UniProtKB/Swiss-Prot annotation:
Protein's name in the database: Orotidine 5'-phosphate decarboxylase
HAMAP family per the UniProt record, alphabetical: OMPdecase_type1_B (MF_01200_B)
One GO MF term attached to the UniProt entry: orotidine-5'-phosphate decarboxylase activity
Alphabetized PROSITE patterns for the sequence: OMPDECASE (PS00156)
Cited SMART domains: OMPdecase (SM00934)
Cellular component per GO, a single term: cytosol
Keyword annotations of the record: Decarboxylase, Lyase, Pyrimidine biosynthesis
Length: 239
């Protein structure tokens, strides 16, 4: 794998509420990462302006708002997300088949079957454990729930899933090679685990079959973020 191919796989998590930070990261990491993840904190603080700032510097956006509501509400919110020109956005698979299928239907109608943002379904959050599921009344194991939700998402026409690296082989087997897998819970060899439980290194996740890697603090908290990002690219290329 080349460095450019590795770069395209890296999504930097913009874990900030400050608009000024958006431009800083867009400039600092423009040749180090392929995409920027805008989550709830940043989007609540800055709104679509954060998306436009990334796009101004030629960056792609993964809008990580994890929609979960009644089907029509999620479908209409999804259309608005796609209209912003983001590359990826997501919703919760736990919202159910109808919510996901209606979203795909609304997007295909809006974009007439042409190019549009890819929709990802969140399976089980990487901070969740078996105990977390039991607290919610779910008796299945984490891997079983991930596969169940990924399969349901695929059936509804969703483009891929957000899932822990540990579940990549199971998802690939259940959903096929053309189903996108975006993996948080990726920690390079030089970084701490923080609050994510089911993790892999970038090289391990890519080897397992991940299409995109979401990485935040190992880059953002590093003394030299650009150098940290370059180290990660090196890990991926080296395999």
């Amino acid at each position: 794998m080349t460095r450019d191919q590795a770069r395209e796989k890296v999504i930097f998590a913009l874990d900030t509420g400050e608009f000024a930070h958006v431009q800083y990261w867009a400039e600092t990491l423009s040749d180090k990462v392929g995409m920027y993840k805008i989550g709830k904190q940043l989007f609540t603080a800055c709104g679509p302006a954060a998306v436009r700032m990334i796009q101004k510097f030629g960056g792609e956006v993964f809008l990580d708002l994890k929609f979960h509501d009644i089907p029509n509400t999620v479908a209409m919110a999804s259309v608005e997300a796609a209209r912003m020109g983001v590359k990826l956005f997501n919703l919760h698979a736990l919202g159910g088949y109808e919510m996901m299928a209606k979203t795909v239907e609304a997007l295909d109608k809006e974009f007439k079957g042409g190019d549009r943002a890819k929709v990802l379904a969140v399976t089980i959050l990487t901070s969740s454990t078996e105990e977390t599921l039991k607290d919610l009344g779910i008796e299945h194991t984490v891997p079983d729930m991930v596969v169940r939700l990924a399969t349901l998402a695929r059936k509804a026409g969703i483009d891929g899933v957000v899932a822990s690296p540990r579940e990549i082989p199971l998802i690939r087997e259940a959903c096929g090679s053309d189903f996108l897998i975006v993996t948080p819970g990726v920690r390079p060899s030089f970084a701490a685990l923080n609050d994510q439980k089911r993790v892999m290194t970038p090289a391990e996740a890519v080897k397992a079959g991940s299409d995109y890697l979401v990485i935040g603090r190992p880059i953002g908290d590093a003394p030299d973020p650009a150098a940290a990002a370059e180290l990660i690219l090196g890990e991926i290329v080296a395999g």
